[in-house]
Design a protein with these regions (language model features):
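Hydrophobic/aromatic-rich structural module bridging two neighboring secondary-structure elements via a short loop
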Residues: 78-132
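Mature, soluble, non-transmembrane domains
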Residues: 112-277
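Residue-level recognition of well-ordered beta-strand positions that form the cores
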Residues: 44-46, 64-66, 79-81, 97-101, ...
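Bacterial N-terminal signal peptides
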Residues: 11-25
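A short, structured loop/turn motif at beta-sheet edges
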Residues: 32-38, 66-75, 101-107, 212-213, ...
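N-terminal secretory signal peptides that target proteins for export/translocation
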Residues: 1-10
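N-terminal cleavable signal peptides for secretion/export
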Residues: 28-91
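Short, surface-exposed coil-to-beta transition loops
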Residues: 58-63, 93-97, 121-125, 234-238
Length: 277
């Protein structure tokens, strides 16, 4: 797996957006509560703060994210474009596309990922992760650029399941959550342990108001991601996000220690509901 800067691989960076919905350890019946809207959202990325140790001097890019409710589950499509400028003057561009699906019970997750950058050929891998009772055991299987099978713990959660769970926790007034998450990444980075802190609900007062997408309030949520099984006290990365009760994220910041990346919603629209009758 190539590196975009020392100590951090591409999928760890990309997963930091898509799996900012990832850290609870609550039963899958959480699926029956929070209502997440089908929507497409576009985000603009920019460099946040950096310290004297940061080799990356500037970041620019765009993210397009589509979450669509289907009769048997949820489809999720992500497109990323990043441009990194290093202190050496070197500029690197990265493109990534991910197409995934999660069943409505939160027990099956499939993914198809394509990545390329300015100095390596395209990498393509597909696979799935499955949990009981859909299967006798919890596991993830890969093909393509990676040919591997992982044994998972049964308390792993997938993205949409987690999104609903964390919103439910916020509505219940819970302040902290932790658990294991399966992230749509390479086998070595597939599972993360995350600790989330949920802040007090705040009014949404941005100039960007999108009918049906943005709501009148949000919760500030701070999630720290750790490599599974590690005893390290410092996370690999940390995310601060503004999460609305319909599952929409309007603003987030990824903190890698030496620097931060800021993303803000630029436009979005609702997707018409599927008739499952």
């Amino acid at each position: 797996m190539f590196k975009i800067w020392p100590g951090l691989n591409l999928k760890a960076f990309l997963a930091a957006y898509f799996f900012l919905y990832s850290s609870a350890c609550i039963a899958n019946n959480a699926y029956a509560t929070s209502s997440i809207v089908s929507h497409n959202a576009n985000y603009t990325l920019s460099m946040g703060k950096k310290n004297s140790n940061a080799s990356v001097q500037d970041v620019a890019g765009k993210i397009s994210f589509t979450l669509n409710a289907q009769c048997d589950g949820w489809s999720l499509i992500e497109d990323y474009f990043f441009r990194f400028l290093y202190e050496t003057g070197e500029e690197i561009t990265i493109f990534s596309h991910s197409d995934s699906w999660e069943d409505r019970n939160g027990q099956l997750f499939s993914f198809d990922v394509r990545e390329r950058n300015s100095y390596e050929p395209e990498s393509i891998y597909t696979g799935y992760a499955i949990l009981p009772p859909q299967s006798d055991m919890a596991e993830a299987s890969y093909s393509g650029a990676y040919n591997d099978t992982l044994t998972l713990s049964t308390d792993i959660m997938f993205p949409v399941t987690y999104t609903r769970t964390i919103i439910d926790a916020a509505k219940q007034g819970r302040k902290f959550m932790s658990g294991k998450i399966f992230v749509n990444s390479t086998p070595e980075d597939a599972v993360k342990t995350a600790s989330a802190a949920i802040g007090i609900r705040k009014p949404y007062e941005s100039d960007i108001q999108i009918n049906g997408v943005t709501t009148s309030y949000y919760w500030p949520v701070d999630i720290a991601y750790f490599k599974a099984g590690t005893t390290e006290s410092i996370p690999e990365y940390q995310i601060q996000m503004d999460l609305h009760d319909n599952g929409v994220v309007t603003d987030f910041m990824i903190n890698y220690g030496d620097f931060t990346v800021h993303a803000s919603i630029s436009d979005a629209q609702l997707i018409e509901k599927v008739d499952c009758m």
